[in-house]
Amino acid sequence: MADDNEFLAIFECVSRFSGATVQVVIDSIMRMTAVPAMERIARLTDGMPVRVQWAGIPTLEWQKTYGLQQPLVELHERFIEEGRDFWTGYAHVPVVVTASIQQSLLFAQSNEYVWHEVVSAETDDEKRSLLNDSDWRARARSSWENDSLETSFFREPSGMMLDNSENDSDPIVSLGDYAMKLGLHPSDALAEWFLHNGLSSTVSMPPWDQDDDMVIRLTRDPNAVGNINDSGAHGQMFCGSGDSIRLWTDYVCSGKLKIEEAIHSQTGKLANHFGFSDRGEIAVGKRADITVFALEEVEHRAKYKVYDVPNDDGGFTWRWTRDPAPVRLTLCNGIPTFDKDGVTGAMPGEMISPS
């Protein structure tokens, strides 16, 4: 845990560079320390010319129900009243994660530390030994029922999808149905599924219910930054890229947002936030970074695996991806990179810096 002096050193350094941004992720899922964490950041940056992007105001229904949302909304409004250069981050899609026993923080983040022992085991033989061990299974059942967070996915196995078998031994099915078929506790059934389908198999967790009203409010808020998605950094943990278009399919097509509001929040608003004054809107003198699409043609496509990520053995491992939405044309610096025939192969992009 960084102390105040360490944070101050960072903020003082950043304040010397015009256009620089400090990004802060606060905890409104596990330890629920979001409010005191942001109050601390606000105190330490008081009087400094520092732009802070903080993530952010929760947009999940359970976070609203648990009283986590309103105090952060009040902080957001206070920062605006004080004239702080604070930008509130949010996501327009609910959190969807994938659990793995090879590499995953999900079990520990859910207070499911008995299952995390399997993740921490260094070899596949050690993992199999734990999954087969009757004493470990008893502890895992108890932890599943009593220690896992009430808001964790493990409390609702009917929504956990066994949809990524390493060896394709079993069809896609929910953990709840799989446990019922085997006549086992969900924890035992999950252990059996990994043993039968391969230790590199993964489980997709159900999305939490989204607070649409808050998403709409923040999309329209000039001091909020949307379109947050870290799927590019977690190719095997989160769903593949493409969730940005759900702002169109879920909110524009349903009439909850105007198309102009959605597009501005993903283009000009973000360009302005990061200091890219030469792009983000269609105007004379701006870079021609343009996407052309017909809204009725756009869909949020199903995810699937492609094996094109280099691994440490000289081969390739997999990642999630999706088929094109599609859009009709993508221009970068005025040059098509995607058109009716697919990817063009052109790479006209350049390194950019804030202006």
Identify the role of each PLM range:
Residues 1-15, 25-250, 254-255:
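Active-site neighborhoods of metal-dependent hydrolases
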Residues 23, 53, 87, 227-228, ...:
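Structured core elements
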Residues 26, 55-56, 191-192, 261-265, ...:
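Beta-strand segments within the central parallel beta-sheet cores of soluble alpha/beta enzyme folds
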Residues 89, 183, 230, 262, ...:
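Divalent metal-coordination and catalytic microenvironments
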Residues 15, 46, 195, 223, ...:
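Hydrophobic alpha-helix feature that most strongly marks membrane-spanning transmembrane helices
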Residues 201-209, 215, 258-261, 271-305:
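Acidic, glycine-enriched loop/beta-strand segments at the rims
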Residues 217-224, 243, 291-342, 346-348:
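C-terminal cap of metal-dependent C-N hydrolases
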